[in-house]
């Protein structure tokens, strides 16, 4: 209680400095504040020189849609120069990781025995988990574009090195290295999305780049189908596939290093007036842009004082068991239905279309209407139905089993909504990037556990694994509703606290969502 009281006193000190009615930003320690505040100060602006945006659009509507309208021309410029980097990063991350799945039908399993193929998926996720806290700290301390560009380039080199692998041990080495360097991708994309867009816009834009998971299925299916027709002697078809995609990834990594801006304030494609417009536009998020000062108290708050942390991590773990399962074994499972290797490769294409469609529809609904709790809850229902049918139907029912497998991707796509929840419902830059990090850690724990459920003894039906998928998807429904309920109650509590009071300007002080009582959660 004493620690909480001290934290409250610290917050009040910061809040007093942020009162736009009496104090300008010159009285604020800008080293502790967000980079946006330093940018405004350098350009002769402060909190008191801007309009009272909260008077234009108030409450949760301003918190979600933004209260300072951004010129469509400027928004299009941001989309034109930022979204392609995010989309390509996520596409290559997903594709490069999933190539192992496609290589399963191209002969990579011919010299593997027992659970060695499962272990290749597991070691990738284990390395990802190990590296995630490190890369999160690097993103906090150094320019995000340089970190992303470097990591993408190196993972492209590692991917190309798969072509030289001829033994299980060498494959384990490159899969470990790939996991280490791909750990930068998702957390980096989420952080960048929060710098340029309001919460409503983030829902749509995160949807756009997360849709590339579906595109990855389509591209991967086409690539693997094409390379299946390669019959060289020096290299196998899967080795050539890894080499080509790896070189493409290297080229994109170099472009990212050179041309991706670190944040709004040094975006080379915006002039000074446009940068100010974007900064004012995202003010209502109450999350700011970024700060390079690591704040350990925000990490402590995340783990010890934030009531959303552990329910969200449990939700991530349960919902993404399906992702780990079908991400590594969809080709293998499809093959058990009686399709040959060419048909199996082509049947991955509808998976991409289904994934892209689910993500695009649900995120556009979130962007327009909100209601993330109800929309996300509805996504578990098709997955539950798919699990039940897969358990019940014999393998001879090809079409029924295939359609049921496709239904599982509805639950898998929930990870996009979790990205959105993290980005929109977390304030304090250190806290936000570490929330994204632990989400990705738990995501990869699920990806470690899931392939191990598909044991060789249970082939070809894998009934124990399918039952585990059913149970975890069912658990997600009440858990998702509970998280939405506590978000709603917290907003109501803060509304009651502030009845009849004038709201102070906290937006760019890098306060957390708990410290900043103006902050409202989307649910």
From Swiss-Prot:
Upregulating conditions: Induced by limited extracellular thiamine levels.
GO MF assignments: transmembrane transporter activity
Transmembrane stretches, start-end: 80-100, 119-139, 142-162, 177-197, 208-228, 240-260, 313-333, 346-366, 372-392, 401-421, 433-452, 467-487
Membrane topology listed for this record: Multi-pass membrane protein
GO cellular component: cell periphery; endoplasmic reticulum; endoplasmic reticulum membrane; membrane; plasma membrane
Bridged cysteine pairs (disulfide): none
Major subcellular site: endoplasmic reticulum
Family matches, as InterPro entries: MFS (IPR011701), MFS_trans_sf (IPR036259)
Subcellular location per the Swiss-Prot or TrEMBL entry: Endoplasmic reticulum membrane; Cell membrane
A GO biological process held by the record: transmembrane transport
One Pfam match: MFS_1
Cytoplasmic domain ranges by topology: 1-79, 140-141, 198-207, 261-312, 367-371, 422-432, 488-523
Its biological purpose: Transports either thiamine or, rather, a related metabolite involved in the thiamine biosynthesis pathway.
PANTHER family: PERMEASE-RELATED, THIAMINE PATHWAY TRANSPORTER THI73
Family per record: Belongs to the major facilitator superfamily. Allantoate permease family.
Protein name per UniProt: Thiamine pathway transporter THI73
Gene name per UniProt: THI73
């Amino acid at each position: 209680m004493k620690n909480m009281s001290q934290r409250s006193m610290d917050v009040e000190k910061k809040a007093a400095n942020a009162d736009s009615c009496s104090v300008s930003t010159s009285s604020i320690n800008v080293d502790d504040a967000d980079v946006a505040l330093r940018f405004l100060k350098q350009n002769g602006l402060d909190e008191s020189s801007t309009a009272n945006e909260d008077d234009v659009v108030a409450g949760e509507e301003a918190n979600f849609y933004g209260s300072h309208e951004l010129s469509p021309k400027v928004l299009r410029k941001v989309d034109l120069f930022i979204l392609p980097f995010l989309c390509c990063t996520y596409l290559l991350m997903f594709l490069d990781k999933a190539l192992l799945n496609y290589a399963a039908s191209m002969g990579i399993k011919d010299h593997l025995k027992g659970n060695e193929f499962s272990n290749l998926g597991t070691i990738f996720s284990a390395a990802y988990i190990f590296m995630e806290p490190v890369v999160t700290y690097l993103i906090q301390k150094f320019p995000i574009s340089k970190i992303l560009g470097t990591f993408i380039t190196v993972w492209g080199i590692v991917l190309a090195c798969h072509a030289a692998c001829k033994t299980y041990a060498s494959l384990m080495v490159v899969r470990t290295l790939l996991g280490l360097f791909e750990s930068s991708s998702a957390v980096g994309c989420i952080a960048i999305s929060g710098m340029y867009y309001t919460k409503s816009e983030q829902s749509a834009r995160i949807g756009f780049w997360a849709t590339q998971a579906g595109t990855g299925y389509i591209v991967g299916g086409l690539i693997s189908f094409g390379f299946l027709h390669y019959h060289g002697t020096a290299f196998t078809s899967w080795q050539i596939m890894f080499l080509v995609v790896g070189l493409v990834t290297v080229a994109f990594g170099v472009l990212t290093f050179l041309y991706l801006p670190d944040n709004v304030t040094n975006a080379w494609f915006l002039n000074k007036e446009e940068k100010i417009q974007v900064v004012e536009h995202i003010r209502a998020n109450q999350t700011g842009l970024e700060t390079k000062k690591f704040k350990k108290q925000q990490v402590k708050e995340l783990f010890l004082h934030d009531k959303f942390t552990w329910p969200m991590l449990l939700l991530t773990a349960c919902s993404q068991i399906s992702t780990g399962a079908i991400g590594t074994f969809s080709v293998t499972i499809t093959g058990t239905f009686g399709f040959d290797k060419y048909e199996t490769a082509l049947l991955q294409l509808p998976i991409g279309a289904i994934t892209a469609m689910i993500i695009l529809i649900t995120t556009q609904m979130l962007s327009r209407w909100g209601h993330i709790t109800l929309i996300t809850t509805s996504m578990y229902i098709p997955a539950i139905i798919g699990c039940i049918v897969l358990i019940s139907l014999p393998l001879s029912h090809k079409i029924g089993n295939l359609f049921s497998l496709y239904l599982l991707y509805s639950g898998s796509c929930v990870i996009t909504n979790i990205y959105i929840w993290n980005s929109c419902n977390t304030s304090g830059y250190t806290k936000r990037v570490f929330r994204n990090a632990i989400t990705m850690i738990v995501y990869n724990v699920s990806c470690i556990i899931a392939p191990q459920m598909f044991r060789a003894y249970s082939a070809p039906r894998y009934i124990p694994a399918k039952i585990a998928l059913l149970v975890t998807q069912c658990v997600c429904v009440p858990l998702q509703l509970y998280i939405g309920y506590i978000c709603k109650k917290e907003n109501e509590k803060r509304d009651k606290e502030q009845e009849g009071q004038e709201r102070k300007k906290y937006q760019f002080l890098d306060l957390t969502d708990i410290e900043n009582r103006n902050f409202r959660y989307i649910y």
